[in-house]
UniProtKB/Swiss-Prot annotation:
Keywords on record: Clathrin- and caveolin-independent endocytosis of virus by host, Clathrin-mediated endocytosis of virus by host, Disulfide bond, Fusion of virus membrane with host endosomal membrane, Fusion of virus membrane with host membrane, Glycoprotein, Hemagglutinin, Host cell membrane, Host membrane, Host-virus interaction, Lipoprotein, Membrane, Palmitate, Transmembrane, Transmembrane helix, Viral attachment to host cell, Viral envelope protein, Viral penetration into host cytoplasm, Virion, Virus endocytosis by host, Virus entry into host cell
Positions in the Extracellular compartment: 1-520
SS bond partners: 9-472, 47-279, 60-72, 95-140, 283-307, 479-483
Cytoplasmic topological domain residue ranges: 542-552
Classification lineage: Viruses, Riboviria, Orthornavirae, Negarnaviricota, Polyploviricotina
Gene3D superfamilies tied to this protein: 3.90.20.10, 3.90.209.20, Hemagglutinin Chain A, Domain 2 (2.10.77.10)
A GO molecular function held by the record: host cell surface receptor binding
Name recorded for this polypeptide: Hemagglutinin
Organism, scientific name: Influenza A virus (strain A/Chicken/Hong Kong/YU562/2001 H5N1 genotype B)
Similarity annotation: Belongs to the influenza viruses hemagglutinin family.
Topology versus the membrane: Single-pass type I membrane protein
GO BP terms in the entry: clathrin-dependent endocytosis of virus by host cell; fusion of virus membrane with host endosome membrane; fusion of virus membrane with host plasma membrane; virion attachment to host cell
Length: 552
């Protein structure tokens, strides 16, 4: 008699996950496990960067801070900073109207500086032949009175005379020195002589690398901050052991303080309206701080610190698990690009919870699920290494800081913006393509592992079992739990069971042959009987026609 068939099936894990990923071939594929690699959240605050506070200029501009706008006194001396924060339109800029020459270049310089030390280079009290305290303006008020920038001195004539100035400062420090000075452009000739006595004046400035001669531009202008005059400010970096020489007979705004560059490093000037949040981060954006190990973010293109790369994507999810198709969903799923299972396993097993791939067996001793730990662990290691590799390759830290251009450089600014947008488009495309390709490969990798497990069993059992076409094998012999375990661990003894399997195969084949013979006899009998009946009917019809004279 036939044995009651024992079976072993190969299958894969399924769960209640609703995580979905995209691949080259499909969109919204539900998977058992996935990992988001796009950071989309921030804390909405300005934070310390690696424990170092930012310099938040509040309502002051960089120019207002460096020149010493009286409304920026809180920044007279500042400690080391990690980055500088300036509002888009700070109220306290150049209180006396005018320009800051090469301002954008100075800001770029500041993006590589972390600390200034302010030092006095020409004391205000040293101008004995000129008025050093009368140079104030209602445009720069302080406590309701006229005042002026704290770090420079507006020199006015004294006793109806403005003697020619010849001053030098030698940088004996070991550090570079940021030196600032300026020129006043009066509204008319009357103001020129009223302030400086001399109708024709100049300012000469020289270092080992600088040769500058300035003359005032006297012109009638509209009033700004109540002033028709204008001031123009300049700066230079004075190297150690170099000297800066000033010569002027009027309109000179002399330096009193300079900035010793005591620490250089990665910094940035960030445009933001946020407040300080008393927090710490490794990555700061104008929108807020990011604390993430993900390789990509879509928060803001400008960052400072150890930051993910900015992309324009809204979703980047890597598949780490398998297609999630529980067995109750009997629909055939599309397969991937790189091979994979030929569709013979209709669904995953939610009952197998301790591995990605495994077995289900049934015999006289019962039935149950068992994960294949070895193939599962290899797959976990492989997928984990791949995800970590992607993150490591993409998570090369860098700063993406904004560049500023003056009004004469708008065409350059537009070109720069187009180039940066182009780079962002390329990065976004690369990131999205990478995710699509890797997801396709991961799902096919899992499918291939299931197929390999199936082949491992098939090669062991050979003709001792029958392939049922659904991922299962039906044994031609009794297979108890010990036998089942040997199939799972690859030690199945084919010769031990081959004789029993052969006999059962032959018995099954004999039943098929016997059944086939019976069907053939019945078929012949039926054919003969039908033929005899037809012959009798034809003969009877002929006799009837003859008796009626109808047959000629």
């Amino acid at each position: 008699s036939l044995v009651k068939s024992d079976q072993i099936c190969i299958g894969y894990h399924a769960n209640n996950s609703t995580e979905q990923v995209d691949t080259i071939m499909e969109k919204n594929v539900t998977v058992t496990h996935a990992q988001d690699i796009l950071e989309k959240t921030h804390n909405g605050k300005l934070c310390d960067l690696d424990g170092v506070k930012p310099l938040i200029l509040r309502d002051c501009s960089v120019a207002g801070w460096l020149l010493g706008n009286p409304m920026c006194d809180e920044f007279i001396n500042v400690p080391e900073w990690s980055y500088i924060v300036e509002k888009a339109s700070p109220a306290n800029d150049l209180c006396y109207p005018g320009d800051f020459n090469d301002y954008e270049e100075l800001k770029h310089l500041l993006s590589r500086i972390n600390h200034f030390e302010k030092i006095q280079i020409i004391p205000k009290s040293s101008w004995s032949n000129h008025e050093a305290s009368s140079g104030v303006s209602s445009a720069c008020p302080y406590l309701g009175k006229s005042s002026f920038f704290r770090n420079v001195v507006w020199l006015i004539k004294k006793n109806s005379a403005y003697p020619t100035i010849k001053r030098s400062y030698n940088n004996t420090n070991q550090e570079d020195l940021l030196v600032l000075w300026g020129i006043h452009h009066p509204n008319d000739a009357a103001e020129q002589t009223k302030l400086y006595q001399n109708p024709t004046t100049y300012i000469s400035v020289g270092t080992s690398t600088l040769n500058q001669r300035l003359v005032p531009k006297i012109a009638t202008r509209s009033k700004v901050n109540g002033q028709s005059g204008r001031m123009e400010f300049f700066w230079t970096i004075l190297k150690p052991n170099d000297a800066i020489n000033f010569e002027s007979n009027g309109n000179f705004i002399a330096p009193e303080y300079a900035y010793k560059i005591v620490k250089k490093g990665d910094s940035a000037i960030m445009k933001s309206e946020l407040e300080y949040g008393n927090c710490n981060t490794k990555c700061q954006t104008p929108m807020g701080a990011i604390n993430s190990s993900m390789p990509f973010h879509n928060i803001h293109p400008l960052t400072i610190g150890e930051c993910p790369k900015y992309v324009k994507s809204n979703r980047l999810v890597l598949a780490t698990g398998l297609r999630n198709t529980p067995q109750r969903e009997r629909r055939r799923k599309k397969r991937g690009l790189f091979g994979a299972i030929a569709g013979f396993i209709e669904g995953g097993w939610q009952g197998m919870v301790d591995g990605w791939y495994g077995y289900h067996h049934s015999n006289e001793q019962g039935s149950g699920y068992a994960a294949d730990k070895e193939s599962t662990q290899k797959a976990i290691d492989g997928v984990t290494n791949k995800v970590n590799s992607i993150i490591d390759k993409m998570n090369t830290q860098f700063e993406a800081v904004g560049r500023e251009f003056n009004n004469l450089e708008r065409r350059i600014e537009n070109l720069n913006k187009k180039m940066e947008d182009g780079f962002l488009d390329v990065w976004t495309y690369n990131a999205e393509l990478l995710v699509l390709m890797e997801n396709e490969r991961t799902l096919d990798f899992h499918d291939s592992n299931v197929k390999n497990l199936y082949d491992k069993v098939r090669l062991q059992l050979r003709d001792n079992a029958k392939e049922l076409g659904n991922g299962c094998f039906e044994f031609y012999h009794k297979c108890d739990n010990e036998c089942m375990e040997s199939v799972k661990n690859g030690t199945y003894d084919y010769p031990q069971y081959s004789e029993e399997a052969r006999l059962n195969r032959e018995e099954i084949s004999g039943v098929k042959l016997e059944s086939m013979g019976t069907y053939q006899i019945l078929s012949i009998y039926s054919t003969v009987a039908s033929s005899l009946t037809l012959a009798i009917m034809v003969a009877g019809l002929s006799l009837w026609m003859c008796s009626n004279g109808s047959l000629q």
